[in-house]
Structures are given as structure tokens and as C-alpha cells.
Amino acid sequence: MDTAEEDICRVCRSEGTPEKPLYHPCVCTGSIKFIHQECLVQWLKHSRKEYCELCKHRFAFTPIYSPDMPSRLPIQDIFAGLVTSIGTAIRYWFHYTLVAFAWLGVVPLTACRIYKCLFTGSVSSLLTLPLDMLSTENLLADCLQGCFVVTCTLCAFISLVWLREQIVHGGAPIWLEHAAPPFNAAGHHQNEAPAGGNGAENVAADQPANPPAENAVVGENPDAQDDQAEEEEEDNEEEDDAGVEDAADANNGAQDDMNWNALEWDRAAEELTWERMLGLDGSLVFLEHVFWVVSLNTLFILVFAFCPYHIGHFSLVGLGFEEHVQASHFEGLITTIVGYILLAITLIICHGLATLVKFHRSRRLLGVCYIVVKVSLLVVVEIGVFPLICGWWLDICSLEMFDATLKDRELSFQSAPGTTMFLHWLVGMVYVFYFASFILLLREVLRPGVLWFLRNLNDPDFNPVQEMIHLPIYRHLRRFILSVIVFGSIVLLMLWLPIRIIKSVLPNFLPYNVMLYSDAPVSELSLELLLLQVVLPALLEQRTHEAVAEGLVRAWTVTAGYLLDLHSYLLGDQEENENSANQQVNNNQHARNNNAIPVVGEGLHAAHQAILQQGGPVGFQPYRRPLNFPLRIFLLIVFMCITLLIASLICLTLPVFAGRWLMSFWTGTAKIHELYTAACGLYVCWLTIRAVTVMVAWMPQGRRVVFQKVKEWSLMIMKTLIVAVLLAGVVPLLLGLLFELVIVAPLRVPLDQTPLFYPWQDWALGVLHAKIIAAITLMGPQWWLKTVIEQVYANGIRNIDLHYIVRKLAAPVISVLLLSLCVPYVIASGVVPLLGVTAEMQNLVHRRIYPFLLMVVVLMAILSFQVRQFKRLYEHIKNDKYLVGQRLVNYERKSGKQGSSPPPPQSSQE
């Protein structure tokens, strides 16, 4: 039935003509077999693909050249094309050099020089600033310091924009945006004010209906609602007179917002891309952006660094605390923080004065500035000061564990204050992170509402920045003090007290050996690489840790609940859990009635305060209160403390003891860093616990199933051991030895000395190199090694294919490495002596043949790359001068040469 009249184009549905013939360029058949070349080119432009989307066959075009094209391009054409390409490359090189010089040289250098000029504190520095800009002294150091300054200013700018969005979307505090009072001049205000004023009060009024222990919000005490109600009442009494003017200002601001042309902003955002802003598109518009970035840096340095620093400096000098601040080694940071504190106090005082004299615009501006300073200080306290306190407290409580004293810590701080503070801050951050993770784990196990006094980080309504904006300072100060007490008490319970018990019961167990140098015959570098590349990935990549921890917590909770008759309080009752869905629906309906959408007069504040002051957690489950409930809660806390103490004792002793015992078979009586012993012991303990849990899970299935499982796992372990010996033993050893012969030995060992090879160190370095090569291979293009590695990863350990790994991965890699090691050795030791050269020449060849052959291979790769590039240039010159068109190639099923023609350049299809 295939006739010429029935063959139509799959795109335009037209028949072929002598001017526009039909082609069948892919595997597709039927009504979509044929297509016009023009239709296909248009579709390829639209889809931006070079293959058929149905059969995945790549379309092929054959070039059509001018009839007068010579068989070989003339030299002058090649030379002209080469000159043109070189000129284009030079132009791009100059442009990108200018871009790099502007962004990596001018911007950071200008920021650094202006920063130094402002903080020098002399008029002469301002006068000599233009000359200092052109100075080449300390150029690299100033550029690096300037990059840090620019990063800080950009972060400050982004933070300000983000804080503005938080205020716009979350609403400003009630003392900054309060409701307009009712008055008779406008009837709509009489309706708006009571509704807006009751928006947050209804929430607080309905809260006592719930259990008091369940009503506190994240991180707040039960009296939080009373405090907030008092604040709202005081603010309303203080600022009632200014409500009408503020409402008018708000309406004017809303009208201004409506006057913005959103289309113009969208068009500007579309035009300004990263390439255009940075100058990577070839234009010089980026010079304007460089000017604005320099101006922004100067403005932010002046406003956010210079002014607060000098305010704090003058205040400290006036109060006589200058010497104490200088002794802290952080004079600039402390002085700037003091300046911000004084600036916040000044702003809130000026805000109060502006409220009294009814300067409404000034009052709002001062209030917004105070919010910015307040949030900045709270962020510094939450992210900087609190982890630092936790880190130092952890160090102080663990001094006896490392046989250290406060004098040692003082000396280390005096020698390197910045490094010491950073390490303590890092330790504190890790401690806070794992504590928060443990709290999240507890929330998954315990009944909703048990941890009412702690923040719920999983709550979708939880927004710490909004709390920083709305809650007063004394609430944050109270929360900070309580957090310090709680975290400090936990450190005492789980670190200081177990150390005292260990020193009393096992006096020879402590201190831990944490010396940087040891007399062990094993290389520290090898142990570190083994720890980082083998042990830690095996421990951290396991997904069962969270499930095991959750199971332990649940088992402890069930045990404590039945012992103290608190099962209903901790986990809830089963029959009540069945009705939890209805209870949650009722709670949500109750919250929906209370959290009514506020009217315009209240703004966004009432809605946000309804979130901050909402009642108990969503999905609250009632519980049964047994007799002597407070006493049982006290016993529960005591039982929890004892459990944490025992768990801490086990974690501090068992892994280290097991690691020391295992490492003693390897190193003898030599002392090893406790990091390695603890990691080794922890790894062994994890393997033991994992094996025991697996066996316990298999026991209920019967003896035959257990034997079958043991047989399967034994076979899998044998296969894994064989693969580990090949891929984690032989390959890293050969790779490390090759690296030693090619790089290390020629650079470190003179010709008149004999190099010594340590297989253990070579293997450890080979493990590192093998992981790097595997990572680069997986990130690179598709080739046989990447395909094999991806297949091995996809199979996993349980579906390990020993034959496939040995045949496709281990054998080729080991063969290449052995050839790389043996061929140069055979040439140097077997072929060169036959040439009759001297012994010195033989030694030179033997020592330098490995790097020489590496250079030969690299040179051949470079030459091959240059040949390919020249061929591409040749084709490009020929196409530019003589190419007149392209013809679509039909798919030939029998010949199979449908892809023989090279694909056309993209420019020819446009």
C-alpha cells in the first residue's frame, strides 16, 4: 500500500515535491516515517535535540559544498582561518582577563584599602587613599582580605533584603504596626478596630481550655501568653493616639506598592542574568556593576562596621574598659558588638521620644532600624555565643579525661586565640546539632505534647526569625539562660560525672592518649587515611542507625512507662489513639475558629501572633494522670538521668577498651592516638551488635531458615572478601606503588641513594587515590570504566556478582597497573644493560624511566588532542568558505551506514 501519493510529512502532513522531497531519516515507520528536511530542521530548533524522540535514532546530515571547492584547502585559506581563530581567542582572552581583574582584583583590593583607611583613624589616611589604591605593597594579602570583606558585605546585604521580606510577609511587631483606634469620623474604622484588636486576644483567651502543660509554644514557658498580653496592652495604651496617622501611612504605602510596574521589573530581571552581570557574555556592562559593588561595599563598611566600632570604642574608653577588651585578643569584634548594643539602646530610646512627639515616619524608621540591630545581635548570640559557651564548657568538664588543666587551655589560647575559639565553637555546634537531632528523635517516639517546653523544629509554623522580630528582648534573654542551664547540666551529667566515676573505678583507664606524636611503628598518616576512607564511611553511611536509636528509645520509654505507670503520659493509650484523628480534626477546627483572618486595620501582626501564641501542638492526645503524678514525673527524670549516665559510661569505656585490646595485637605496647582505638572499637562493636540483631531477627523463622540464611550470608561474605582483596587490597597497593615510583621517589630521593618502599603506606595512599579516581570517573563522561563502576554500585553487596567484577573491573584495572609497573622495569633492567651503557646511566634510567614514560604518555595525549582540534578547525574553515547546504541522510536498514555521515554544525541548522 506504500505509494508515492500516500507518503506525507509527519509534521506538515504534506506530500513530497521535487523541490521539497520526503526523507525517512530514522527507524520510525508508518505515517511518521517521512518528513521534509525543512520541517525537521525547524523541529530540531524548537526541541533543541539531535535525535528522534520516539526511536532515539540520531539524525544525520551530509554536507553540500560548492562545486569550485578544491580537494585540499589552500594554505592561505588555512592561514587566514587560523589567524581569525587566534584573533577571536585573543579578544576573548583580553575580555575575560579584564573581567577577572575587575572582580578578583579591583573589587576586593578597593574594599580592603577603604576598610583599612577607615579604621586607621587618621586624616592623612583619607588624603592618601587614592595613592594607596594604586600601591602594589601586600597586593595578594590585601586581595584575599578584600574578598573576605566583600563576602561579608554581600551577606549583610542579602540578610537585610531577606529580613525585609520577613517583616513584609510576617508582619512587624505590634509596637511598630498597631491597629488604628475606633473613631466616629469614618464608620469603617469602627468595625475594623475591634475585630483586628481581638484577633490575637481570642487565641490567648481560649488557651486555658487546654491542659496547661500542653499550651506552651516552642521554647516558651506557660506564662508566655500572659507576658505577651501585658505587652500588647501596654503598647496599645502607649500608641493609641498615633493609630490614625499610621493607618493613613499604611494605605499610602499600599497605594505606592500598587503603582509599581510589575512587567518592567520582570523584564529587567529577565535581561539581567549572571553572565551579563559578571561580564561573561562579552559586553562591558559589568563595569557599571563593578562600580555599584564598590559603592555598596563602601556604604556597608561605613554603616555596619565603622560607625558601630567607633561608638563601642568611645564608650569603652569612656568607661575605662579598654585594657580589658584589648587583653581578650578580640578587640575589634567585642568593640563592634558593644557598639551595636549601645546603638540598639539609642534607637529604642529615640523611638520612644518620636512616639511622644508624634513623629510617625521617624518613629517607624527608628523602629525598623532597631529590629535590624536586634535580629543581628540575636543571631550572633544564637549562632556564635551559645555554641562557644557549650564548646568551652565541654572542654572544661573533660579536662581530666585528657590529663589537661585550665593553665594548658590558657596557654593554648594565648598562643593561638583565633584557632582555639574556632575549635571550641565548632565542638559546641556539633554538640547543639546532635542534641537537636536527639530531641527530634524523641518527638517521633513520645506522645505529642510531652515535650511542650522544647522547640519543635519540625513544626511548619516555627520561624525563629519571626520570633526574633516579635518577641521582646527579655524573653530571648530568659530563653538563653534556660538553654545554657539545660545544656550545661547535660554536659555535667554525661561527661563530667562519668569521668569522675571512671577515675574512681578504673584509675588506670584514663587519661586518653591524644598526643600528636607517638612511638608506634605504624604511620599516623596511614591510620588517618584508613580511618577516613574505610572506618568512618562504613559507620556514617549506614541507614539503620536512626532506626536502632529509635528502637532503643522506644524500648526505654515502654519500660519506664510500665514501671512508673506513665505509659499513658509518655506514649498515649491505644484506645485513645484510635480516636486521635477525630480529636485532631476538632483541634484544627478550634484553631481555625480562633485564628480568623485579621482585617486590614490589624495588618499581618494579628495573624502572626496567632501563630506564635497558638495552643497545644497539633494532634494533641489526652492522657490518664495516675496517682502521685508529680512524684512519678520526678522518678522518671531520675531514671532518665541514671540511664544517660550508664549510657555515657559505656560509650566512654567500651569502644576505647575494645580498640586498645585489638590494636595491641598490631602495635604491641606502643601508645596509639585514642581516635584510632575508639574508631576501631566502635566499628567492632557495631559489627557485633549488627550480627546479634540479625541473628535475633532470624530466630523466629526456624532452624532451617537460619541455616539457609547463614549459608547465603557466608557465601556473600566470601564473595565480598574476594572483591575486597582485589579492589581494596591489590588495586590500591599497585596504585600507591606506581605513585611512589612516578612522583614521590624521583622528587625526594637523590640518585646516589636507594629509595625505600613501605607497602603499608603505599596501600593507604593508594586507597585515597583510588577513591579520588573513582569519584572523578563517576563525574566524567560515559565510558567503559564508569559503566562498570555504576553497575557494581547498583548491584550492591547483597547482589554482588563476583564473575562480573573480576572480568569487567578487577582484571582490566590490575592488568593496566601491572603493565605500568612491569614494562618500565623490564626496559630499565633488561633492555638497557644490553646496550652497554655505564652503571651510572643504568641507575639514571632505572630511576627516571617511570616519570619519563609518564611524560611521553602525557605528550602523546596532548598531541592527539591538538590533532583533533586542528581537524575541527580545518572542517570549520572549509564549512565557512565552501559549505552551501546540507542534505538529510535516509536511514538504511540493511547497510547500517546511516550514521556514517558526520552531523552538521549547529550553525548550519539555524
Curated annotation (Swiss-Prot):
A Pfam family hit: RINGv
Subunit structure: Interacts with DIO2. Interacts with SQLE.
Entry PTM: Auto-ubiquitinated, which results in proteasomal degradation. Deubiquitinated by USP19; protecting MARCHF6 from p97-mediated proteasomal degradation.
Record bears the keyword Transmembrane: yes
Binding site residues for Zn(2+) 1: C9, C12, H36, C39
In-chain residues carrying the UniProt-annotated modification N-acetylmethionine: M1
Recorded catalytic activity of this chain's protein: S-ubiquitinyl-[E2 ubiquitin-conjugating enzyme]-L-cysteine + [acceptor protein]-L-lysine = [E2 ubiquitin-conjugating enzyme]-L-cysteine + N(6)-ubiquitinyl-[acceptor protein]-L-lysine
Topology, Cytoplasmic side: 1-91, 164-283, 358-376, 443-480, 541-632, 700-721, 786-815, 870-910
Record keyword Ubl conjugation present: yes
Top EC class of this enzyme: transferase
Protein EC: 2.3.2.27
Topological type in the membrane: Multi-pass membrane protein
Record remark: domains: The RING-CH-type zinc finger domain is required for E3 ligase activity.
Mapped zinc finger ranges (RING-CH-type): 1-62
Pathway: Protein modification; protein ubiquitination
Name used for this protein in its record: E3 ubiquitin-protein ligase MARCHF6
Sequence segments annotated as region (Disordered): 185-256
PANTHER family, alphabetized: E3 UBIQUITIN-PROTEIN LIGASE MARCHF6, SSM4 PROTEIN
GO terms for biological process, alphabetical: ERAD pathway; proteasome-mediated ubiquitin-dependent protein catabolic process; protein K48-linked ubiquitination; protein ubiquitination
Residue stretches spanning the membrane: 92-112, 143-163, 284-304, 337-357, 377-397, 422-442, 481-501, 520-540, 633-653, 679-699, 722-742, 765-785, 816-836, 849-869
